[in-house]
Amino acid sequence: MTDTEHRLEVVEAKEAVRDCLARYLDLCDVPGPLQSPDQLGVLFTDDATWEGLGPEYAGKFGIARGRDEIVALVSRYLPPADHFLRNVHLLGSEQIRLDGNRASGQWIMQQLSLYATGTAEILCARLTIDFDLGRTGGRTAARMSRFCTRRMFAAPLPAEAMFQRI
């Protein structure tokens, strides 16, 4: 493999990781494009884990093992469940490392939420995620094999601000 081919492989692998995580967060936004829980499931390996870490998230989320448990856990917070009225995710501070057909990454996620209860908050969490890399249709594809989230910051927001129109 030439240096150029290797560099292209690295770029494609990192882009596949970004695409997978961005799709997951897009599906978790409310309102969002989620039509079926299966859309979430295909983003994870069969034996994936999804885990809440730290004092705020370990008890709230615990650990889900396997694709079906992960989809069930995440679906509890998405329509048609009456949890969020609005919810949006933003990512930053990206770090992606590649090791053969595996990748790992860390991000800071900002989440703005308006709950069905009428309360609103902003929070930041550290996401630490492992991915399996493969080829699908001639392209590099990533699926999450381990997803960990740890809350770093949270503060209430005035709910009326979430209803403002631009």
Where in the sequence are the language-model features?
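A beta-strand edge to alpha-helix "cap/lid" segment located at domain peripheries
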Residues: 2-5, 83-166
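Short, low-complexity N-terminal intrinsically disordered segments enriched in polar/charged residues
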Residues: 1-30, 34-43
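A near-ubiquitous, low-amplitude feature marking generic local secondary-structure context
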Residues: 3-7, 23, 53-57, 79, ...
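Conserved aromatic-histidine-acidic binding/catalytic patches
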Residues: 9-16, 62, 84, 119
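A solvent-exposed, acidic/Ser-Thr-rich amphipathic alpha-helical stretch
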Residues: 34-109
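Short regulatory "switch" loops immediately downstream of catalytic or recognition motifs
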Residues: 25-33, 49-55, 113, 136
